[in-house]
UniProtKB/Swiss-Prot annotation:
Processing and modification events after translation: Sequentially cleaved by DegS (a site-1 protease) in its periplasmic domain between Val-148 and Ser-149, then by RseP (a site-2 protease) between positions Ala-108 and Cys-109. The N-terminal fragment is then degraded by primarily ClpX-ClpP in an ATP-dependent fashion. Sequential cleavage by DegS, RseP and ClpX-ClpP frees RpoE from RseA.
Free-text comment about domains: The N-terminal cytosolic domain interacts with sigma-E, and upon overexpression leads to temperature sensitivity above 37 degrees Celsius and cell lysis in stationary phase. After degradation by RseP residues 77-108 bind to SspB, targeting RseA for degradation by the ClpX-ClpP protease.
Region annotation (Sufficient to repress sigma-E) ranges: 1-97
Any one GO molecular-function label of the UniProt entry: sigma factor antagonist activity
Protein location: Cell inner membrane
Purpose: An anti-sigma factor for extracytoplasmic function (ECF) sigma factor sigma-E (RpoE). ECF sigma factors are held in an inactive form by an anti-sigma factor until released by regulated intramembrane proteolysis (RIP). RIP occurs when an extracytoplasmic signal triggers a concerted proteolytic cascade to transmit information and elicit cellular responses.
Name this polypeptide is given: Anti-sigma-E factor RseA
Similarity comment text for this entry: Belongs to the RseA family.
Subunit structure comment from the entry: Interacts 1:1 with ECF RNA polymerase sigma-E (RpoE); this inhibits the interaction of sigma-E with the RNA polymerase catalytic core and leads to a decreased expression of sigma-E-regulated genes. Interacts with RseB with 1:1 stoichiometry. The liberated N-terminus (residues 1-108) forms a complex with SspB and RpoE; binding to SspB is competitively inhibited by ssrA-tags, although the 2 proteins bind in opposite directions in SspB's peptide-binding groove.
Source species of the chain: Escherichia coli (strain K12)
Bilayer topology annotation: Single-pass type II membrane protein
This protein's encoding gene: rseA
InterPro entries, per the entry: Anti-sigma-E_RseA-like, Anti-sigma_E_RseA_C, Anti-sigma_E_RseA_N, Anti-sigma_E_RseA_N_sf, RseA
Length: 216
């Protein structure tokens, strides 16, 4: 209602002393009165080239109304120490699988070494079985004929060389198999010893349960 009265007063359609008195003492009505005059001058093209606006109070009020945003508190994550991994239930569950995978990997390496060694031995055997080309002494143009000589090695020497290669190959294979069996036994004994220590520690300290001692 007051805005309509201010618009009529600005257009000269009405003249009310009470409205003028209220306009003189009401800051909000004064701002509305200024806005109406600015709008009318802008529509008529009577505005000056430079307009002075004081919006600092409104900006300050808007800033004060903005909620205060507090940054979220970052909680540092504590990583378990290496000596604590063995006491974790997950590690106790994964450890037997890791041991089995290690044994399978060692067995695969030994099998691969045996296969490669056999193939290498077969290749050497085929090479040694090929006869060498005999060397003949031809008759010269002038003079006497020289005796014919053959550069073929004896069968006994070839057989001895093959037997030595076979024995060396077998010795290497036996050494690899013995080393694998020794490593497997040492790893199995170490795993059993660590599991026994873990179970003994869980029994001695009350209130601590691991995956191996917890009842299903």
């Amino acid at each position: 209602m007051q805005k309509e009265q201010l618009s009529a007063l600005m257009d000269g359609e009405t003249l009310d002393s009470e409205l003028l008195n209220e306009l003189a003492h009401n800051p909000e009505m004064q701002k509305t009165w200024e806005s109406y005059h600015l709008i009318r001058d802008s529509m008529r093209g009577d505005t000056p080239e430079v307009l002075h606006f004081d919006i600092s109070s409104r900006v300050m009020a808007a800033i004060e109304e903005e909620p205060v945003r507090q940054p979220a508190t970052l909680i540092p994550e504590a990583q378990p120490a290496p000596h604590q991994w063995q006491k974790m239930p997950f590690w106790q569950k994964v450890r037997p699988w890791a041991a089995q995978l290690t044994q399978m990997g060692v067995a695969a390496c030994v099998s691969l070494a045996v296969i490669v060694g056999v193939q290498h031995y077969n290749g050497q055997s085929e090479t040694s079985q090929q006869p060498e080309t005999p060397v003949f002494n031809t008759l010269p143009m002038m003079g006497k004929a020289s005796p014919v000589s053959l550069g073929v090695p004896s069968e006994a020497t070839a057989n001895n060389g093959q037997q030595q290669q076979v024995q060396e190959q077998r010795r290497r294979i036996n050494a690899m198999l013995q080393d694998y069996e020794l490593q497997r036994r040492l790893h199995s004994e170490q795993l059993q010893f660590e599991q026994a220590q873990t179970q003994q520690a869980a029994v001695q300290v009350p209130g601590i349960q691991t995956l191996g001692t917890q009842s299903q």
